Amino acid sequence: MGKVSANNQSGFFKFYIDTALLLNAEFISSFTNCINSEYNGKVKISYSSSSQQFKVIVYEEHKREAFSLFEEIVQKLKRESTVYKKPRLDIHPFGQLHYDFTTLLNFQRYLDLGYGIEDVKIKENEDIVKSKVGKKPTSSDFYIPCLIKPKIITPFEWEGNFKQVIYSPTVYNGSFKRLFYLPDNNDLLKEFAHATNTKYKASLKDNKIVVLANNDQDINAMLEKMKHIENLVSQKVYEYPEETLVYAGKIAPCQLKFLKLKFENEILYTAMHTTSIFKSVFNILGSFYTMRLLRNKHDGDSYELVPVFAKNPSKTPPCNDNFKIFSDDIKLIGCKIFAGVSLNFSSPKPAHRFYELNKTSSNLSIPVLQKPSNFHSSSTELSDNSIHQGRRAVDPVVNQNNPSNFEEMIMNKLNKLPTIDKQILGTSSLTHFQDKTTAIEHSINKSNSKQPPRFKFQLPPRPTSNTLPLEPEEELVTRYSVSSDGNTVDEAITKQSQTFQLVNSNEFNEVNANDVHKSLRQNCAKLDFDDSKSKNLLSVECLELDKGSDCSTPKSGSLTPSIDMKFLRLQDEKMDDLGDNYYTILMSSNPVSSYGVGSLYLFQPKIVCSEKYINHEEIDNMNLKSLHRWLSRSLHVLQSFSGEIELNLEFGVILYPNISSDVSACSHGFMNIYKDLNLPRSYFADCITKSVSNIDSLLNTPVKILFGRTEYTYPLIEHEVLDSKNYFVFKGSLLFTDDKRNKTEDSTVFFSMICSSKLDQFAFYKDSKQSSTCTINFPLALWDSRLRIETKVPLNDAILTEFSKSIRFRNVNKDLLLVFGNMEDRVIIHSVTRINENSVPFNKNLLPHSLEFILKCSKVKSYDISPSSINSKEAFVCLDRSKESKPIESCFSLSIQSVYMQSQFKYNNSIRAGETAPWKLANKQFIGGAITENVSDLYTAAIIMVNQLGGIHPTI
């Protein structure tokens, strides 16, 4: 915004420049000194921090060249500020206040039309307006307008008695016109006054507002709204306490977290649905639980887990699609073994090489062994669908009771196969090869060899990781069958494919309520109520339904709730079954066990639910876009950390708070950053979805970034798989003995053990609770951001090595089991999960200085741990259930990694070893000096200043 006024009586011309820039005191001082020195005697420039304007004074003797001097100064300011930092595109959360610098040069347009300093004429068809109301402008007194004209508040007369309070901004250092006057000519003060039945008098000169009302209540309401907006614009945290609730279901892996936002309405809660809500101990088909929130003035807030039974559900939840990144259309994973084809491993682009081979795969013939008639058809892969491609089975005519004949037959079959390159044998993805230099190492070495432009990075050599490499080879799993005499007999040698198909079967059975209740009572009679799990379930209470609903509170010794509910959905407007007590805010319908449907519901009082949040599809869309923006921003922030770090996200469902209309309008402030992304109208950008299709959409949705006035579109990731892994994760506790000073002390250490899918490589980590939380200020928007960093500490102990040797595969009753020693005296296993992980690179166009970040897309399956009936010292998990049982549900996770997180960030040797860049807003070397480089404009500047974006970041 530029304003020029000339006054011959005062002897000089005055120009005012509203820069719309985010500048610090150092730059302002340097720029003003430079201009005053260069134009000494002609121009004097000063800066007002209150109005955030440059005032340029041109002396009388140089009035003829006043406009040319002003143009030169504006161009210098534009050029210098661009080098220091890009123009701030958004200085107000309610709308775009970015003024084009060409507007400031409109004076030259009037000069080109023949108007001089002494003979300026006012015409109705021109954009020149009067500077003073009721006074005809003279040749020496004129006003040049800009894009947006501020409103002028005229005083008014109040009739009758009234109370008044004088308000002026206290937190915000600037004029209140920037707070309450929007660029679309909307006046927030007028809207607030209408909503609170008040009136006001505004004085732009004194920067004060006089609030008038008939009572104190209306005045306080008006003041609260104005202070609220002032806090938002000044980026003050407005009461965002964060709380972590108790675990629901199985305690160890499940966590519920919510953000409490205090506004005009009552608080709403954010809940995350996780697959860790385990099955019922009653093993009843079709059973699931409902979680509700209890409000107690004395005890606070608490959750209760209530068993609920579905009867004739009206709708079946839609099945989720596969990830496109793992589908066959893109041809990323599932490389076949070729015969008679040699690979050139010297090629710098392994992915391109495998793509070429994939085109010729259809012309190659591979001998396939016949499958025995008594071989079960269910797959042992992670995929929910049975995939038999690449399996090797035996001839049905072979007598499998004779191990020697069976082994001889297998060897004969294998000898008939063509000769296969050893380096080709065992590959499971198109970009993975067993060489000393893998594809991922190649990309890391390439990244380390690059020097960031015009910025001094000092990165030490890549540290040697204690993590054992987990080769994603296609494994040969020996299946066993146990005869009646206890002898194990080889049944078949099967090869397990690494094809990653993310199929989530959302099916559930319609059961009769009476049959369920009858079965429930029968199973309750068999329960051991001394068991801790039974006690947890017996402590729950039923929902307080209407009088017409049948609900009995469970009592000690018998749990017989008689709850008859319909399967409610978010879009259901009528909640007849719940009555007037509760309103269903969140409903999810993903199965959590092989015995039925598991759903996590959140019930809220009906009075606090907004009608606009009933449509869950809109909420899902906002969640997806929010996560999309969060991921793209996180890439820049992560490079400042040192150590072995992983930032993880697990997908759930999050609701947005029921915010008021004035706060909702704030979301339009950062619309100009992503024009086509309707960002969620919320203060936190955290949120995620359980839907596989939404994750697929996330990975394939382009990121739109605004560079100055030009918008660029980049895909979030590159469709190239750098690495693929399939491994198990055991989590447990170890009784650790430490001998110091002849004193033996026993302590329990919680650990994680990563085991390759072939059970031949292991890595042990101590579950360190040391985690750091980094908060980053973000002045351009209203959300907070928090990055939670957790480190891994290697753990070496002989007892864990001994335990790892006890892990093996076994086939019992057509079910593939993973058996391990139950060493309760030293090692106790709490959970077992299987992870299929693919690593894909982010688009380098989104990264500063071509840093190579990797996105890891994983499918995680959790299993039950059951004691072995054959050997009391063993336990097992069932990896491949028979067709009669439904597969255990999988969850999907994303993690971000970079080689720069394993090195030290430095800037001109000013940061010592073991330190990272200070988290300060004015630190220009922060995030690799991205804001000092002309590379990413506002986008990069925004990324380095986000304040507390975290929320739910559970690790696997």
Curated annotation (Swiss-Prot):
GO MF:
chromatin-protein adaptor activity
What keywords does the record list, in alphabetical order?
Cytoplasm, Cytoskeleton, RNA-mediated gene silencing
Per the record, its GO cellular-component terms are:
cytosol; nucleus; pericentric heterochromatin; spindle pole body
Loss of function: phenotype: Leads to sensitivity to thiabendazole and microtubule depolymerizing drugs.
Indicate yes or no for the key word Electron transport.
no
Query: For this chain's UniProt record, which GO biological process terms are given?
Result: regulatory ncRNA-mediated heterochromatin formation; siRNA-mediated pericentric heterochromatin formation
Compartments, record wording: Cytoplasm; Cytoplasm, Cytoskeleton, Microtubule organizing center, Spindle pole body
Could you tell me what this protein does?
A: Involved in RNAi-dependent heterochromatin formation and centromeric silencing. Required for the conversion of centromeric pre-small interfering RNA transcripts into small interfering RNAs, histone H3 'Lys9' methylation, and the recruitment of the RITS complex to centromeric sequences.
Q: What is this protein called?
A: RNA-silencing factor ers1
| Species assigned in the record | Schizosaccharomyces pombe (strain 972 / ATCC 24843) (Fission yeast)
Q: Which gene encodes it?
A: ers1
